[in-house]
UniProtKB/Swiss-Prot annotation:
One of its GO terms (cellular component) is cytosol. This is Pleckstrin homology domain-containing family J member 1. It comes from Bos taurus (Bovine). InterPro entries: Boi1/Boi2-like, PH-like_dom_sf, PH_domain. It comes from the Eukaryota. One of its GO terms (biological process) is retrograde transport, endosome to Golgi. It holds the Pfam family PH. Residues 15-108 form the PH domain. SMART domains: PH.
Length: 149
């Protein structure tokens, strides 16, 4: 997916769901851990040099895995290239768990599945499709398409 640099910079300035200085090591062999300001905004994880306002990179959190690594650290890898991992070091195990939970819930796919799950629960309780009033109940994006919510 391609993004306009100005759009990404504008998005990076939006209020963050989470933000902290973390240790970060990129996927290149031999890369070292560097302190980065890391911001979660919608489904993007932006990272900044600690003394700069513009991001130096962004990860789109779709089709990715968030994995707990050694104590106080986690990694993000992408399904199309699982060997390419970004490692993050937190100040505590509690902070690590908070980041992992937030990152796992940040993807569009997670939100779509949650909507489908709660839509079905409401329909079971009320007998009515809550999306019907908006005229979108038959749209493909709100269907399971063979996958369980």
């Amino acid at each position: 997916m391609r993004y306009n640099d100005k759009e990404l910079q504008a998005l990076s300035r939006q209020p963050a769901e989470m933000a902290a200085e973390l240790g970060m090591r990129g996927p290149k062999k031999g890369s070292v851990v560097k302190r980065r300001l890391v911001k979660l905004v919608v489904n993007f994880l932006f990272y900044f040099r600690t003394d700069e306002a513009e991001p130096i990179g962004a990860l789109l959190l779709e089709h990715c895995r968030v994995i707990h690594e050694e104590p106080n650290s986690f990694s993000i890898s992408f399904l199309e290239d699982p060997e390419r991992k970004y490692h993050f070091e937190c100040c505590s195990e509690e902070q690590c768990q908070q980041w992992m939970a937030a990152l796992r819930q940040a993807s569009y796919e997670f939100m779509r599945r949650s909507l489908i799950f709660y839509r079905n629960e409401i329909q079971k309780m009320t007998g009515k499709d809550p999306l019907e009033q908006y005229g979108i109940s038959e749209e493909a994006r709100f269907q399971l398409s063979g996958l369980k919510a």
